[in-house]
């Protein structure tokens, strides 16, 4: 991957489902298994094809995130190429990306800040699809969004909160776009059409517009998906990560400098 990869992490929400923990800090800085959720999330990207040719875009909220997230990232990751964008109005996921458009060029990964998974991002080095959505089969998908895949293996559409159990490929909240510009064009179209749900612009609607326009979109299955969006889910994730940490140790590498630590 010759072009700079942009990793975009929207995190502007109020964190109401994590109160009282989010009264004094934004949700990504809440501790899970000895580290903040944000640190676990950034660890997840260690397998990107060219770590030293990667830039991060953090979309933060105006309350606590605007001050605390940049300070935390600058202190913890001094070698990271990072940009920070403030989303002052909660108008949805697509709106957040629209605000960050000046930084979004070429290949891009977007992952929500409460999504932890076991993805291998090294596959992006040779990826030919226009869009990849990471998915995980679950017994009951009705609380989530799912990807509908055609006989040819390409995604035909996304469905939010399906009414049946027939399609259980749940979209976990992480996507790759071969060209960020294509997504931004779809977001422009989404906003022009006024495609919203509860007055918010959802990313899956923008991707559906990309598919309408011919974008080849596929899924990539994962085996582990950990959520930190609610207190109960965070407690489960904390237990899972602690159990995993107790089974093995590994050498860590600073992916921004290549130095073992």
Where are these predicted regions, by residue range?
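Conserved N-terminal catalytic core of the sugar/cofactor nucleotidyltransferase
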Residues: 1-12, 17, 23, 30-31, ...
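Left-handed beta-helix
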Residues: 1-4, 151-154, 181-182, 188-261
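Active-site glycine-centered loops adjacent to acidic/histidine catalytic or metal-binding residues
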Residues: 13, 114, 137, 230
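Short glycine-enriched loop/turn motifs at secondary-structure junctions
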Residues: 22-24, 166-171, 219-221
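A structural signal for short hydrophobic beta-strand segments in well-ordered beta-sheet cores
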Residues: 29, 147-149, 219
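A general structural signal for well-ordered alpha-helical segments in protein cores
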Residues: 38, 66, 70, 97, ...
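Short, surface-exposed amphipathic charged segments that create phosphate/polyanion-binding patches used
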Residues: 97-104, 146-149, 232-238
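Conserved core of the sugar-phosphate nucleotidyltransferase
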Residues: 116-194
């Amino acid at each position: 991957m010759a072009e700079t990869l942009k990793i975009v992490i929207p995190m502007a929400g109020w964190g109401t489902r994590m109160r009282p923990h989010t009264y004094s800090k934004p949700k990504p800085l809440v501790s899970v298994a000895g580290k903040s959720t944000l640190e676990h999330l950034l660890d997840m990207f260690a397998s990107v094809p060219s770590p030293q040719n990667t830039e991060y875009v953090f979309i933060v909220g105006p309350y606590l995130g605007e001050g605390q997230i940049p300070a935390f990232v600058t202190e913890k990751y001094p070698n990271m190429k990072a940009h920070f964008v403030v989303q002052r109005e909660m108008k949805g996921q697509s709106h957040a990306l629209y605000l960050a458009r000046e930084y979004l060029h070429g290949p891009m990964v977007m992952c929500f800040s409460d999504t932890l998974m076991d993805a291998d991002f090294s596959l992006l080095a040779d990826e030919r699809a226009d869009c990849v959505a990471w998915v995980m089969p679950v017994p009951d998908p009705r609380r989530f969004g799912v990807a509908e895949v055609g006989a040819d293996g390409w995604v035909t559409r996304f469905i939010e909160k399906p009414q049946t159990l027939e399609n259980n490929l749940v979209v976990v909240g992480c996507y790759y776009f071969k060209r960020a510009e294509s997504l931004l064009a779809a977001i422009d179209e989404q906003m022009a059409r006024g495609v919203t749900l509860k007055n918010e612009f959802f990313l899956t609607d923008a991707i559906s517009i990309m598919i309408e326009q011919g974008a080849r979109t596929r899924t990539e299955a994962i085996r582990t998906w950990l959520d930190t969006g609610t207190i109960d889910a965070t407690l489960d994730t904390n237990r899972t990560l602690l159990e995993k940490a107790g089974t093995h140790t590994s050498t860590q590498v600073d992916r921004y400098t290549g130095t073992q630590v």
